[in-house]
Amino acid sequence: MSKRDFYEVLGVSKGADEREIKKAYKPLAMKFHPDRNQGDAASEEKFKEVKEAYEILTDENLRARYDQYGHAGVDQSQGGGGHGGFGGGADFGDAFGDIFGDIFGGRNGGGRRGPARGSDLRYTMELTLEEAVRGVSKEIKVPSLVHCEVCNGSGAHTGSTAQTCPTCHGAGQVQMRQGFFAVQQACPHCHGRGKIIKDPCRKCHGEGRYQKTKTLSVKIPAGVDTGDRIRLSGEGEAGEAGAPAGDLYVQVHVKEHEIFVRDGNNLYCEVPISFTAAALGGEIEVPTLDGRVKLKVTPETQTGKMFRMRGKGVKSVRSGQVGDLMCKVVIETPVKLTESQKELLRQLDESFSGAAAKTHKPRSEGFFEGVKRFFDDLTR
């Protein structure tokens, strides 16, 4: 099945910068996240599609490949990990190497030149809003290929050594003639390594590395948000025959909070207040991530009014600036009234009628006057 355009998936233009891409990604990731759509296979596929698009378009190198070659330029780079939520990285040549390898009889038309660097891995870490705002250290378990400590990555059994390949004489490549062309390809005898292991290591079976789930401690800085990525250098898969290891990229996903909604460095919440507090004003308690604080409500406050509490938001992980907490007032209508309470409200409402209506209820009176004028105009 053909893939959708990554820019279309996120709903951004091809000229979108990283900030715009991140802003588009967050609501989509929250909408289709498996935790919110348990058992919904369609939403899970959508989440994977959105996540893949974000990872490609926020990686400068991968985005350049995608812009030039489309999906063919990045599909191989994202594949090869095969460890649950992980994906391995690969050199750009690998995206097309198999095509030429099939034609000329080898894995890559140009042949492999020495041991390959280990693949990069990806891990998605879920955080609560509190953990993201304050920072946290967490242990994660990562399935990976690790360096064999028994043979020290050589692949040879203790007491033996790898022998120079008699076919390519250690070059890792052989020259093959295809009609008029002489083509370099990976040596089929040693698979491009230049060495032959006759007595392989019992632990890694001659590979120099083996599969293991390793435990890592990851320090998450304060202020991270959904879409942020943390690179752990050298914590990816071990390289072949002592080549450098790849990197591990920890992708942050912040779970929804029951009270607060985050937008950049600002936090938003709704605060219910009684209609008497709204009319007369006073102090109310509002929640913050540091505990409850007092908020002064001005008299005659209308529902929907926003109060700003400076410095009660999130400290930026990049600039160090602290955002604000925006409290939206929602006036609560009293319920389950007694007869005496209903009578008091009727008396109060009557006191607002007549000539006093415009003074005490300017918005509603203005609205109904506007409605009356509208219908009067229709009947003329």
Curated annotation (Swiss-Prot):
Alphabetical UniProt keywords: Chaperone, Cytoplasm, DNA replication, Metal-binding, Repeat, Stress response, Zinc, Zinc-finger
InterPro entries (alphabetical): DnaJ, DnaJ_C, DnaJ_domain, DnaJ_domain_CS, HSP40/DnaJ_pept-bd, HSP_DnaJ_Cys-rich_dom, HSP_DnaJ_Cys-rich_dom_sf, J_dom_sf
Gene Ontology terms, MF aspect: ATP binding; heat shock protein binding; unfolded protein binding; zinc ion binding
Name of one Pfam family that matches: DnaJ_CXXCXGXG
Positions annotated to bind Zn(2+) 1: C148, C151, C201, C204
CDD domains noted in UniProt: DnaJ, DnaJ_C, DnaJ_zf
Cofactor note: Binds 2 Zn(2+) ions per monomer.
Entry's Gene Ontology cellular component terms: cytoplasm
Major localisation: cytoplasm
Subcellular locations according to the entry: Cytoplasm
Binding site for Zn(2+) 2: C165, C168, C187, C190
Repeat region (CXXCXGXG motif), residues: 148-155, 165-172, 187-194, 201-208
Notes concerning its domains: The J domain is necessary and sufficient to stimulate DnaK ATPase activity. Zinc center 1 plays an important role in the autonomous, DnaK-independent chaperone activity of DnaJ. Zinc center 2 is essential for interaction with DnaK and for DnaJ activity.
NCBIfam families per UniProt: DnaJ_bact, PRK10767.1
Family as reported in the entry's similarity comment: Belongs to the DnaJ family.
Annotated protein name in UniProt: Chaperone protein DnaJ
Organism field: Aeromonas salmonicida (strain A449)
Lineage of source species: Bacteria, Pseudomonadati, Pseudomonadota, Gammaproteobacteria, Aeromonadales
Protein's gene: dnaJ
